[in-house]
């Protein structure tokens, strides 16, 4: 638990093109400003909802000026702003206004009660890992990106299987024929990797997971690697192969292109309410323990 007020400027970020988001954002802005904090808005958010009276800043300006960012939206909104603010080490507070909400853990109905408490200095902090990747073609880097959840190499919807050659730290691992391969952070282990039968990694685990997508051989299983591993995936066969970063940006690949993936030097700080439990999140989102139980989280 971190105590002691260390925040002065609070940035608000909302999910663009989301119906009914303007009112909760305006309510949150008033709630935070009333407690003496300077409130700024991410520029696209301010433009989309038509709010005035607060500075509208780019993500880079938020990183330089704001002490914390409060994100109202779904996991995709959190992923997007998290990647942009990671170089500035700006902490994030996530309010769920989407559907699943693995990383936006505060319910919208609770934001006026919980956000001021966190901003007063009472919170639980954790650092989330990122991946950085680059595409090599003929020995030269042609594309670079970072990912919060995962780097996914996969075929297009109308092509056949791809053949990939994977190596770790310069050591050959395998060739596999499949629909693709997911390289995921612990945060990303509950995203696409989970739907492909990958394991759940606790967010504080220092690991990277490789998960095949519909492999031709059932012996091609997910594997968890140390988080200092350097992973290389070469396109050996197939056509119309793409690489996606958090499923939000992608680029087409050619035969013999290599995707190099490693843990980023940046992390994203998350601030949670006191009493936050990752296991409670899993129970709720994955519908574990569906039957009524008197076993609740107890303070240690």
Swiss-Prot record:
<dbReference type="GO" id="GO:0006741">
    <property type="term" value="P:NADP biosynthetic process"/>
</dbReference>
<comment type="similarity">
    <text>Belongs to the NAD kinase family.</text>
</comment>
<keyword id="KW-0067">ATP-binding</keyword>
<keyword id="KW-0547">Nucleotide-binding</keyword>
<dbReference type="InterPro" id="IPR016064">
    <property type="entry name" value="NAD/diacylglycerol_kinase_sf"/>
</dbReference>
<feature type="binding site">
    <location>
        <position position="248"/>
    </location>
    <ligand>
        <name>NAD(+)</name>
    </ligand>
</feature>
<dbReference type="GO" id="GO:0051287">
    <property type="term" value="F:NAD binding"/>
</dbReference>
<dbReference type="GO" id="GO:0003951">
    <property type="term" value="F:NAD+ kinase activity"/>
</dbReference>
<dbReference type="InterPro" id="IPR002504">
    <property type="entry name" value="NADK"/>
</dbReference>
<dbReference type="Pfam" id="PF20143">
    <property type="entry name" value="NAD_kinase_C"/>
</dbReference>
<keyword id="KW-0521">NADP</keyword>
<protein>
    <recommendedName>
        <fullName>NAD kinase</fullName>
        <ecNumber>2.7.1.23</ecNumber>
    </recommendedName>
</protein>
<feature type="binding site">
    <location>
        <position position="179"/>
    </location>
    <ligand>
        <name>NAD(+)</name>
    </ligand>
</feature>
<feature type="active site" description="Proton acceptor">
    <location>
        <position position="75"/>
    </location>
</feature>
<dbReference type="InterPro" id="IPR017438">
    <property type="entry name" value="ATP-NAD_kinase_N"/>
</dbReference>
<feature type="binding site">
    <location>
        <position position="177"/>
    </location>
    <ligand>
        <name>NAD(+)</name>
    </ligand>
</feature>
<dbReference type="GO" id="GO:0019674">
    <property type="term" value="P:NAD metabolic process"/>
</dbReference>
<dbReference type="GO" id="GO:0005524">
    <property type="term" value="F:ATP binding"/>
</dbReference>
<dbReference type="Pfam" id="PF01513">
    <property type="entry name" value="NAD_kinase"/>
</dbReference>
<dbReference type="GO" id="GO:0005737">
    <property type="term" value="C:cytoplasm"/>
</dbReference>
<dbReference type="GO" id="GO:0046872">
    <property type="term" value="F:metal ion binding"/>
</dbReference>
<keyword id="KW-0520">NAD</keyword>
<feature type="binding site">
    <location>
        <position position="214"/>
    </location>
    <ligand>
        <name>NAD(+)</name>
    </ligand>
</feature>
<keyword id="KW-0418">Kinase</keyword>
<feature type="binding site">
    <location>
        <begin position="75"/>
        <end position="76"/>
    </location>
    <ligand>
        <name>NAD(+)</name>
    </ligand>
</feature>
<keyword id="KW-0963">Cytoplasm</keyword>
<keyword id="KW-0808">Transferase</keyword>
<feature type="binding site">
    <location>
        <begin position="190"/>
        <end position="195"/>
    </location>
    <ligand>
        <name>NAD(+)</name>
    </ligand>
</feature>
<dbReference type="InterPro" id="IPR017437">
    <property type="entry name" value="ATP-NAD_kinase_PpnK-typ_C"/>
</dbReference>
<comment type="function">
    <text>Involved in the regulation of the intracellular balance of NAD and NADP, and is a key enzyme in the biosynthesis of NADP. Catalyzes specifically the phosphorylation on 2'-hydroxyl of the adenosine moiety of NAD to yield NADP.</text>
</comment>
<feature type="binding site">
    <location>
        <begin position="149"/>
        <end position="150"/>
    </location>
    <ligand>
        <name>NAD(+)</name>
    </ligand>
</feature>
